[in-house]
UniProtKB/Swiss-Prot annotation:
Function field: Probable acetylcholine-gated chloride channel regulatory subunit. Does not have ion channel activity alone as a homopentamer, but forms a functional heteropentameric ion channel with acc-1.
Source organism: Caenorhabditis elegans
Glycosylation site residues: N135, N176, N225, N246
Extracellular side: 20-277, 325-338, 516-517
Gene that this sequence comes from: acc-3
Description of the deletion phenotype: Grossly normal movement.
Protein name, as recorded: Acetylcholine-gated chloride channel subunit acc-3
Lipid bilayer topology: Multi-pass membrane protein
Length: 517
């Protein structure tokens, strides 16, 4: 009986000694805990513990329940005291769940995000209490009873923790005192709107996190450095008007009168999806411009039809421009769409200006033709009256003619050369024949007495003046031939307008499609 008792006591002592001897796994666990005392592990890494559950006489493990651990941790806990006198490091991570909207009118964006905070609180260590679990998952009621870094979105317009159906706050405490807090927040932040390249623009939106109550001497806020501090829960975030093209994080130190604060900034870049504007603005303006060029093919006689095409094109462009611009904020600088519309309006206006030039030239040409026709009719009438009033005979002597040789131009004797007989003719074509005659011909005219010579010399004076007048008229006709006709201007416009518009398109699309990249 006594021997049996000694064997039992030896077994108990052996079991106790083996339980107190640390295994290699336990040693590594202790070393891991010491290494992560101030730099917590990622939340996905299970926190080991060196606590070994004791057993009762029946062989059942004895561990401390979560309720008991919480009661002991919160007993005499001071929530207003920072976890460390030398300051605490708070690690931040953000997961983007969804972007709800990007508003150009109010210059902001709305999104749902998960905000993760990690810090060490030595007052919440419970590994020595032999816990039944390696972590404690608690609700927001316990979070209100412990110390928090009071993280805020310092530049947000609004921020609310989701309540669907309860407050979306997650709290986990690890045995080494690591506190992991996660919020699901709907936040509205500002955007730096720049519409210079609209609708090929990119907009940048920012959210800044910082501790509202503690400067960086007490709370040193940092982005998580062992994982991606900012990530998307979706592969791609696409909105009706925008797509998230880039996102990044940054850290800067902001100086306030109360000290220096660490500001953690998230930057989101949204690129506009301009397909809607291609179909609603650019393609209709292309068609309007092409329609305005049809007037060049109608000819200078179709002034009313060409005017209708030009005016309707101008009104259509103005309506399209106003319909698109009314949904955008009023800015004082020129946008890419403004450049497009103004240039298109300029092309349509220039087509109307070309039409005005064609119409003016056509009207002047018609007036000139009417005056020439009227002048020809008057000359024909005078010629007819001169024939009827001619009463002198071609065979009369010179003495029977009047004293003034200008009145008796048709009364030249038959022996005068034929080139001089036409002097008195009112036909302009016949009058030009006097240019052939010279003074020597006149002086040697047969049977020409003094009166006849006076008559012919008088005719020579008018012939010389007529020759000078004919030279000037021929020079004027040469100059008139150098002027553009309406048909030539239309043909030139059919080449210049499409060519200049094509050049503008190359410059426009090359610049605005590459300005953001």
């Amino acid at each position: 009986m006594i021997r049996t008792r000694h064997v039992f006591l030896f077994a108990v002592l052996l079991a106790f000694a083996s339980s107190q001897t640390p295994t290699p796994e336990a040693k590594s666990s202790e070393q891991s805990l010491e290494e992560n005392k101030f730099f917590p592990l990622p939340p996905t890494t299970p926190f080991p513990t060196n606590a070994v559950a004791a057993t009762d006489e029946d062989g059942e493990e004895l561990c401390t329940s979560d309720k008991t651990i919480i009661e002991k941790l919160l007993n005499n806990y001071k929530s207003f005291r920072t976890p460390s006198e030398s300051g605490v490091i708070v690690w931040i991570e953000v997961w983007v769940q969804e972007v709800n909207s990007v508003n150009e009118i109010t210059s902001d964006f709305d999104m749902d995000i998960y905000v993760t905070e990690l810090w060490m609180d030595s007052a919440l260590r419970y590994e020595h209490l032999n816990p039944c679990k390696y972590n404690l998952s608690l609700n927001s009621e316990i979070l209100d009873q412990i110390w928090k870094p009071n993280t805020v979105f310092i530049n947000s317009k609004s921020a609310n923790i989701h309540k669907s159906p309860f407050k979306n706050v997650f709290l986990m405490i690890y045995p080494n005192g690591t506190v992991w807090v996660n919020y699901r927040v709907q936040v509205k932040g500002p955007c730096s709107m720049d519409f210079s390249a609209f609708p090929m623009d990119q907009q940048s939106c920012h959210l800044t996190l910082e501790s509202f109550s503690y400067n960086n001497q007490e709370v040193d806020m940092q982005w998580m450095n062992w994982t991606t501090p900012l990530s998307l829960l979706k592969k791609e975030i696409v909105l009706p008007d925008f797509v998230m093209s880039n996102y990044s994080t940054s850290l800067k130190h902001e100086i306030y009168p109360a000290g220096v604060w660490n500001e953690l900034t998230m930057t989101f870049v949204f690129s506009r999806r301009y397909g809607w504007y291609i179909f609603q603005a650019y393609i209709p303006t292309y068609l309007t411009i092409f329609i305005s060029w049809i007037s060049f093919c109608l000819g200078p006689k179709m002034i009313p039809a060409r005017t209708m095409l030009g005016v309707n094109s101008l009104l259509a462009l103005t309506f399209q421009f106003g319909n698109i611009m009314r949904n955008l904020p009023r800015v004082s600088y020129v946008k890419a769409l403004d450049v497009w519309m103004l240039v298109c309006l300029t092309f349509v206006f220039c087509s109307l200006l070309e039409l005005a030039i064609i119409g003016s030239m056509g009207a002047r040409s018609e007036n000139r033709q009417a005056q020439q026709q009227k002048q020809q009719d008057e000359e024909a009438t005078k010629h007819q009256k001169g024939r009827e009033n001619s009463t002198c005979s071609h065979l009369m002597s010179p003495s029977s003619c009047p004293n003034s040789p200008r009145i008796c131009r048709n009364h030249i004797p038959n022996d005068v050369p034929q080139s001089f007989k036409s002097y008195g003719s009112t036909d302009p074509r016949m009058r030009k024949r006097l240019i052939i005659a010279s003074s020597s011909t006149i002086s040697h005219a047969p049977n020409a007495n003094r009166s006849e010579k006076v008559l012919l010399l008088d005719g020579l004076e008018e012939t010389q003046f007529s020759q000078v007048e004919t030279k000037f008229s021929s020079m004027a006709s040469i100059k008139m031939k150098k002027h553009w006709t309406t048909e030539e201007i239309d043909r030139l416009s059919m080449i210049m307008f499409p060519g200049l518009f094509t050049l503008f398109n190359i410059i426009y699309w090359t610049y605005y499609l590459t300005v953001n990249t």
